[in-house]
């Protein structure tokens, strides 16, 4: 018995569990003694039984409200009557039916929900509702994949062409205004050639 105790003490005091020390312990005792050590990351987790993924509060469900209390049986009934109806459509129908109920018809379900909430507060006094963050949806025109170099080059060329056409249009328009500003004003005494020339420039 003394040799077993000294062997166990040397094992827990050493950082590496050497095979020589483990051989001094019987097989059935060694398996039961090291079961917790091998499965847990630390002695604290083995003693307390806590899970590293989260506390118990993260797994606690919210207390049901009046609508959920009412819709439990109604949803089951509607699903049995309409086996091909989708769950989303059932939810829409239940929401519409709930709105059509009077306050007197809703009141028993509000009372039941208040009782459930009181029981929930008593059972989980430190409970706080933490809604899950929804993943941000990317816009339809936004993509994480890199754009094709050929398409980028093509779009740049098209943009340059548009800018070039706009610049040419502005330059032509300003040049025409400049030329029209130097034309003599047309009047009734002007010759037919002058009137034709003026109409030609104004049509451009």
Curated annotation (Swiss-Prot):
**Gene name, Swiss-Prot/TrEMBL:** SRY
Could you tell me the keywords of this UniProt record?
Acetylation, Activator, Calmodulin-binding, Cytoplasm, Differentiation, DNA-binding, Nucleus, Repressor, Sexual differentiation, Transcription, Transcription regulation
The UniProt record lists the keyword Cytoplasm: yes
Q: What does this chain do? A: Transcriptional regulator that controls a genetic switch in male development. It is necessary and sufficient for initiating male sex determination by directing the development of supporting cell precursors (pre-Sertoli cells) as Sertoli rather than granulosa cells. Involved in different aspects of gene regulation including promoter activation or repression. Binds to the DNA consensus sequence 5'-[AT]AACAA[AT]-3'. SRY HMG box recognizes DNA by partial intercalation in the minor groove and promotes DNA bending. Also involved in pre-mRNA splicing.
InterPro entries per UniProt: HMG_box_dom, HMG_box_dom_sf, SRY, SRY-related_HMG-box_TF-like
Q: Provide the residue ranges listed under DNA-binding region in this record.
A: 60-128
Q: Which GO terms describe its molecular function?
A: calmodulin binding; DNA-binding transcription activator activity, RNA polymerase II-specific; RNA polymerase II cis-regulatory region sequence-specific DNA binding
Main localization of the protein described in the UniProt heading:
nucleus
Q: Which domain of life is it from?
A: Eukaryota
- List the PANTHER family hit by this protein, alphabetically: SEX-DETERMINING REGION Y PROTEIN, SOX TRANSCRIPTION FACTOR
- Localization: Nucleus speckle; Cytoplasm; Nucleus
UniProt's post-translational modification comment states: Acetylation of Lys-136 contributes to its nuclear localization and enhances its interaction with KPNB1. Deacetylated by HDAC3.
Q: Where is this region: Disordered?
A: 175-204
For this entry, the protein name equals Sex-determining region Y protein
Q: A Pfam family for this UniProt protein? A: HMG_box
């Amino acid at each position: 018995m003394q040799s077993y105790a000294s062997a166990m003490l040397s094992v827990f005091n050493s950082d590496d569990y050497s095979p020589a020390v483990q051989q001094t312990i019987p097989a059935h005792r060694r398996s039961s003694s090291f079961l917790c050590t091998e499965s847990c990351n630390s002695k604290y987790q083995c003693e307390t039984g806590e899970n590293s993924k989260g506390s118990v509060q993260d797994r606690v469900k919210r207390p049901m409200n009046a609508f959920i209390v009412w819709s439990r049986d109604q949803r089951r009934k509607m699903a049995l009557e309409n086996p091909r109806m989708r769950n989303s459509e059932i939810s829409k129908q239940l929401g519409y039916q709930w709105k059509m109920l009077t306050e007197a018809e809703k009141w028993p379900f509000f009372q039941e929900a208040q009782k459930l909430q009181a029981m929930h507060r008593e059972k989980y006094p430190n409970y706080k509702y933490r809604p899950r963050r929804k993943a941000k949806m990317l816009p339809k025109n936004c993509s994480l994949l890199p754009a094709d170099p050929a398409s980028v080059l093509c779009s740049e060329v098209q943009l340059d062409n548009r800018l070039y056409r706009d610049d040419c249009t502005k330059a032509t328009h300003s040049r025409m205004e400049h030329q029209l500003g130097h034309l003599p004003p047309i009047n009734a005494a002007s010759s037919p050639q002058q009137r034709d020339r003026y109409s030609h420039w104004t049509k451009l």
